[in-house]
Amino acid sequence: MTPTGPSHHSMAPKRVLPAASQSNMYGNIRSASTTSTTASTSSQALRLLQNAKTSKNADNRIAHAERQGPPSAHPAAMQKPAARVAPSNENRPDPAARQHQHQQQLQQQKATGHDRVLKESQAGNSTTTTMTSTQSKEANKWSLANFDIGRPLGKGKFGNVYLAREKKSKFIVALKVLFKSQLQKAKVEHQLRREIEIQSHLRHDHILRLYGYFYDDTRVYLILEYAARGELYKEMQAQKAGHFDEDRSAVYIYQLAKALLYCHEKKVIHRDIKPENLLLDLKGDLKIADFGWSVHAPSSRRATLCGTLDYLPPEMIEGKTHDEKVDLWSLGVLCYEFLVGKPPFESQGNTETYRKITKVEFTFPKHVSEGARDLICKLLKHNPSHRLSLEGVIAHAWIQEKISQRS
């Protein structure tokens, strides 16, 4: 695929994801209950893989799923979880043994290291791809034949996501299948190329790994780390109060600040931090999952309007250039949404939202503590240079208090 030209971002309605975020169909994966244990989450994942061996090949399984209907062009379709169909009992292993086996698999993947397992399965060939002149050579190291394909886990505008297992190593992954025709129609090939280029080079505990990619005549396949507990946004919605408590919010902000600090050290600006782009792994730890709007900008300030309306900083709305400090603003908005259940500048119309953002006009509900208010106010500064640094976020008294209580 080749880029078709520069990005042209049109402002989306509230809570409607931009094109890059719509491709984050993997974010629909989540456990049946927000209180699921490690064992039940493991068992669920293995059940999704149950019928992989009954297909003649992986392509037939994907083709069958695609025949159920084309991916919806409406972003709301992404919020609908895949239907659960009970697997056949034929040749079904004992549930307790299956659960134990899968739990061991996920733990072994973590202990052994993601890269090592997949690299060994390719007999020494590197699986980490780079967007260089060797793109085709790298991509050809993988094919659909390398994977057992499980059930579809999510559907979005550009394709589907499947739970999958690399045949040789038994390594469990999420396989994002994107339709070239849809990418070309939306003119977002360049965003996909950018996402692959950036995410494949990042190695951090709180950033979802992109192990590699490959493609055929009609589809592009991304081999992604499997985050068993799914999308953080849905986890938040499932809370009785509609938002997280302060202990949990502080832990997530701490983990995200560490990941963003790593990104900024690598000269990567995310530009689209929001709950929908964050996943939870088997242990409940946060993972940044979508880099479609990210840029690698070592020495320049960007002027592109991107991201989600509620999370846009004043400098973007005002048409000014921006740098990595846009992520600091988004972190403040996210912290507020974690604690309140909605973004601080949410309004009935876009014009009013714009006005509130440029005036930094918002209020706190009574239940938000002084410590949390202090952190949010230090991040939501109109002048980017006045925003609290990521090091300051990590060292903030409210964050440290909650982190120490957790440990």
UniProtKB/Swiss-Prot annotation:
ATP binds at K157, K176, L224, E225, Y226, A227, D290. It catalyses: L-seryl-[protein] + ATP = O-phospho-L-seryl-[protein] + ADP + H(+); L-threonyl-[protein] + ATP = O-phospho-L-threonyl-[protein] + ADP + H(+). Keywords: ATP-binding, Cell cycle, Cell division, Centromere, Chromosome, Cytoplasm, Cytoskeleton, Developmental protein, Kinase, Meiosis, Mitosis, Nucleotide-binding, Nucleus, Serine/threonine-protein kinase, Transferase. It is an enzyme of class 2 (transferase). Residues 1-43, 66-137 are annotated as: Disordered. CDD domains: STKc_Aurora. Pfam families: Pkinase. This is Aurora kinase.
